[in-house]
Amino acid sequence: GLGDVYKRQVICGVVATGCGGGNDDDRIEIEYWHANGAALTTVLEEIKADFEAKNPDYKVKLVSYGDYNTLRDTITSAIAGGIAPTAAQTYPDHISLYLEGEALQSLDKYINDPVNGMSKEEQAQFIEGFWAEGTIYDTAGTRYGMPFNKSTELMYYNADIFAKYGWEVPKTWDEVIEVAEAYKKTTEYAEAIKANPGKVYALGYDSEANLFITLTQQYGAVYTSFDANGKGIYNAFGAVEADVLKSKASMNWYLEEFKKGNIATSTAFGTDYCSDAFKAGQCIMTIGSSAGATYNDGQAATGVKFTTGVSAVPQKDLENGQVIQQGTNVSLFKCSDAKEELGGWLWLKHMVSYESALKWALETSYFPIRYDVLNSEEYQNHIKGNIIADDGSVVEGIQTLAAKAKEAGLAQSQWFYTNVAFPGSSKARDNAETIVQQILYGDSMTVDKAYTDAYNLSLIHI
């Protein structure tokens, strides 16, 4: 079976070391597989050039796959065939899959290495929530990833209508409902309903999986965890009664407010994202990715143009803030060639270094992953839209919506949560999405049955 195939020695690098580059190039080749698009790959090429200049014994071969699922499936097949890249971009669910194949190298032995490792001071520079996601794969907290491109969710709102009626931007879900009830009494709402009967709400949530997990945790429940034997369990779906009850309370609440026409998800608008509905006036608040700010820009609306505001994800209780962190990490595979594996580690260490992380934060829509980058003069000027004149003086600029999103997103970092990852946890996300869709849009589906169905489906995958 697949397990037996997996157990074979994994040989890193599709090209055997030493014969990849011909006689004129005896550098050791590091293969890095990723799923970044063209614009991000350009930045990656710059990071690679820096690395090769500093490490003349190594060369990096960047191999791009169109999307994250293709990347995951290609690596899984490669592992089964006894080959793998030296290093790759990974989501937590991918990491747990590769661990089934015993193909990943723990980063702890390299981090703790006296020569090529990473000091405690250096490790402390990483934003805690991002750094913690590297150790969610077993009860021992073994590190299999370091953060690379990171984003979160935010609330975007129509700042013009908020200003017109003097509404405070809601920080809690109770306040969201207050705004929603006030909104339903406005002429704007009446006009929107006339134009889009049955498809107007105060707030739309993009990701139904994120909605389920985030609300479950805001209500004080645990979504998934490891049991006493280190096996992954689905607390909120059915494994732990106390967690199930709290999670169901969150979904029952969302359902009630949905029925009142206050809040919905992207499915209500017939789309995967609420951004078009938001720009069309079908909702005045939307929760979506911090990396997708430009899609929610009211200045790009086809009808009445408006200013988009950015704020934190609403909470049930501000004392127990819970916000998802999104995006990928970077991981190292076990190699039969020790020099290649060391090179892979050095490459990953370079990718998350101050210089590389600063470049990534300045040139992409993703967050700084480190405090020293966040607090740097370059990043602070970038985020404020300031221009540096030829004489070195700073000219105050105008902050873009994308920059506002980066700033507001990281301001929530104390609320970032991570969920443990194990074989089957990615399927749990799919089932979480299904629960929300069934409860809100399914024909006569009860909350209890939606949970039972999801739990039974999840157990098949363990």
Placement of each model-derived feature along the sequence:
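Extracytoplasmic "Venus flytrap"/periplasmic binding protein-like
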Residues: D50-G129, D160-K171, S275-A277, I284-M285, ...
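Extracytoplasmic/periplasmic substrate-recognition and gating elements
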Residues: K59-K61, G141-T142, K164-Y165, E241, ...
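Extracytoplasmic/periplasmic solute-binding protein
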Residues: E133-F148, E153, I177-A236, L255, ...
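C-terminal capping/gating helix-and-loop segments adjacent to ligand/active sites or protein-protein/ligand interfaces
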Residues: A389-Y455
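Glycine-centered hinge/linker elements that transmit conformational signals in sensory
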Residues: A180-E181, A228-T267, V313
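Hinge/lid segment of periplasmic solute-binding proteins
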Residues: D93-T152, K194-P197, L215-Q217, F226, ...
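Short, small-residue-biased leader/transition segments that mark boundaries at the very start
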Residues: G1-Y6, I462
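Short, well-ordered beta-strand elements
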Residues: D26-G37, Y58-V63, A87
